[in-house]
Amino acid sequence: MVMAKNLTKFYVVFLVVLMMVVSLLLAIEGRPVKDSSRSLTQMRDSSMFNGSVIMSSFKPVESSVKDLSWLATVKQSGPSPGVGHHRAKGYKMFGRANDSGPSPGVGH
């Protein structure tokens, strides 16, 4: 009976440690959020997060609208979404097989 209590305590401690390790790995796995060209760690060390925000460092609204470098954080990798070659080109053929038959295979 004493061994069963020790074994239960071992499993509880093991599960708690495992959950802590998994949560730590999940927390450090993600990529840092980028603000223009600076990463989140650089932003955290900046004067904005230390409480000493300098008003002259703010950009005017016009330059913020023209500066579209923040769009680089939206898509960093992976396949491109495609421009228009997957759109339905002929609505008359929609719902029918255009060229039926077996596909020629990869690269043909």
From Swiss-Prot:
The modification Hydroxyproline is found at residues 102, 104. Residues 28-92 form a propeptide. It comes from the Eukaryota. Residues 1-27 form the signal peptide. The mature small signaling peptide is generated by proteolytic processing of the longer precursor. Transmembrane segments: none annotated. Interacts with CEP receptors (e.g. CEPR1 and CEPR2). PANTHER family: OS06G0637400 PROTEIN, PRECURSOR OF CEP16. This is Precursor of CEP16. It comes from Arabidopsis thaliana.
